A protein has these predicted regions:
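Short hydrophobic/aromatic patch on the recognition helix
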Residues: 43-51
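DNA major-groove recognition helix of helix-turn-helix
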Residues: 51, 62, 157
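Short, well-structured alpha-helical segments
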Residues: 87, 146-154, 158, 182
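C-terminal peripheral helix-coil segments that are non-catalytic and often amphipathic
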Residues: 162, 166-196
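Basic, helix-initiating cap at the start of DNA-binding domains
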Residues: 1-42, 59, 68
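Hydrophobic alpha-helical connector segments
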Residues: 67-110
Length: 196
């Protein structure tokens, strides 16, 4: 059974990698799922079995992205506040250069493809909404009360990600961006800790 799971994971990765390479080279709207399948050496049906929509091919880590804040809150230590858990998560991601932050080489090309595609912009907004909803569910047991807490916490996370994206797209040095964003994150989470 482990071999089968490994083969499925390898096929999924091959399809996602082929899709991203084509999208970065030609743009999202100029690539078909059939071309992705051909590049990944699978059938179109196989591509759709792994990725039900073309947008799923581009945002292949969407479930991880949607659940990251909620998982940090759910999995935190008993003494750690929800704000502390999200702060720790973001700073750990920043320290290790997590690919979803966009500090890696080529990140500006990824975000240019999103900017050029209304469909991808809409999907990015949907993913942000779903992440906020997942966080609200996770916070329900931790903080109770109004949904604004999840909106504020998710909003800070989105703002920090946007700062990274905008600075990298403007050609800033990734290490300088990392330092700037760390200072902003520390200040933002300090302020948020007073709300919880």
């Amino acid at each position: 059974m482990a071999l089968r799971a490994e083969k499925k994971a390898a096929t999924r990765t091959a399809i996602a990698d082929a899709a991203l390479a084509l999208f970065l080279a030609r743009g999202f709207d100029r690539v078909t799922v059939a071309e992705v399948a051909e590049a990944a050496r699978v059938s179109v049906n196989t591509a759709f079995n792994y990725f039900p929509t073309k947008e799923d091919l581009f945002f292949d880590r969407q479930e991880q992205v949607v659940q990251r804040l909620a998982a940090a809150v759910r999995d935190r230590a008993p003494h750690e506040s929800p704000v502390g858990a999200v702060r720790r998560l973001f700073l750990e991601e920043l320290d290790r250069g997590d690919p979803t932050l966009g500090l890696s080489p080529g990140a500006e090309a990824f975000w240019q493809v999103v900017e050029d595609s209304p469909a991808l912009q809409a999907r990015a907004r949907l993913l942000a909404q779903l992440a906020e909803e997942a966080l609200a569910d996770a916070l329900g047991g931790a903080l109770g009360g109004p949904r604004w807490r999840a909106a504020v916490l998710a909003g800070v996370d989105r703002a920090l990600h946007a700062q990274i994206r905008d600075r990298i797209r403007a050609g800033a040095d990734p290490e300088a961006v990392r330092a700037e964003v760390r200072a902003e994150a520390e200040a933002a989470y300090d302020a948020l800790s007073k709300l919880a």
